[in-house]
Amino acid sequence: MRLWNSVINGNGKVKEYDYKGKLRFEGEYLNGKMNGKGKEYKDGKLEFEGEYLNGLRNGKGKEYDYDGKLRFEGEYLNGEKL
């Protein structure tokens, strides 16, 4: 389920929720894909925050474990850690 905020033609800020109503993603879309800064959540808990390009993690980012502890901080390229 998606809740679009100020999105025109797939561009703008968005919040996505899972079927249980828990936040799954919040950030910006460009041409219907994640672009710019955003945050991913798993079971309502922050799992990743960082930059996206064409729907993939790209640029600086941080991954967190289920307890909220920083697990990785670094660069991504085309969805892969560098």
Language model region names:
Residues 1-82:
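Glycine/tyrosine- and acidic-biased, solvent-exposed loop/turn segments at the edges of beta-strands
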